[in-house]
From Swiss-Prot:
InterPro entries in the cross-refs: Ribosomal_bL19 (IPR001857), Ribosomal_bL19_CS (IPR018257), Ribosomal_bL19_sf (IPR038657), Translation_prot_SH3-like_sf (IPR008991)
Gene: rplS
Record key words, sorted: Ribonucleoprotein, Ribosomal protein
Listed NCBIfam families: rplS_bact (TIGR01024)
PANTHER family from the UniProt entry: LARGE RIBOSOMAL SUBUNIT PROTEIN BL19M (PTHR15680:SF9), RIBOSOMAL PROTEIN L19 (PTHR15680)
Any one of the GO BP annotations: translation
Name of protein: Large ribosomal subunit protein bL19
Function: This protein is located at the 30S-50S ribosomal subunit interface and may play a role in the structure and function of the aminoacyl-tRNA binding site.
Length: 160
């Protein structure tokens, strides 16, 4: 009889544990649903846009400074094929921030200066690598447009 009583008591305890577990999960789901509902009702159009932009940002971008020599891998679609074309040059300007951040890269191709503006978080930019750091004292290096030959070189910086 004592054994039956112990078994009955254990059975009641396990039933209590099971009901307690289901009750807590139900409460948690209700709380989660309540928080989600509150969060959904508080989202305005500007908050939705900010959240969407935050999701679109690339996570693994190197620190880029004006004066750096960078190699940008640009996706190019030719017919059905897609390939990555490297573009290497000196960063002469940085603009904006967040999702719309751009860099202007200048290089000399066959004696002619070529500048391209890249949106850093664009899907067209496949890769971005800093080849060497440049030592400059300006935020914009537009004066390089007027220089020819060796005068367009930027001194190398070793501390970054």
């Amino acid at each position: 009889m004592i054994i039956e009583h112990k078994m009955a008591k254990e059975k009641q305890e396990t039933e209590l544990e099971i009901t307690n577990e289901t009750d807590t999960t139900t409460e948690l789901t209700v709380e989660k649903q309540g928080k989600e509902l509150i969060a959904q009702t508080n989202l305005s159009s500007s908050n939705l846009i900010k959240e969407f932009e935050r999701e679109q940002l690339k996570k693994q971008l190197p620190e880029i400074y004006v004066g750096d020599t960078v190699k940008v891998g640009v996706k190019i679609t030719e017919g059905n094929k897609e390939r990555v074309q490297p573009y290497e040059g000196v960063v002469i300007a940085k603009r904006h921030g967040g999702l719309h951040q751009t860099i202007t890269v200048r290089r000399i191709f066959q004696g002619i200066g070529v500048e391209r503006v890249f949106m850093l978080h664009s899907p067209q930019v496949a890769s971005l690598k800093v080849e060497r750091r440049g030592k400059v004292r300006r935020a914009k290096l537009f004066y390089l447009r007027d220089r020819v030959g060796k005068a367009t070189r930027v001194k190398q910086r070793f501390d970054r």
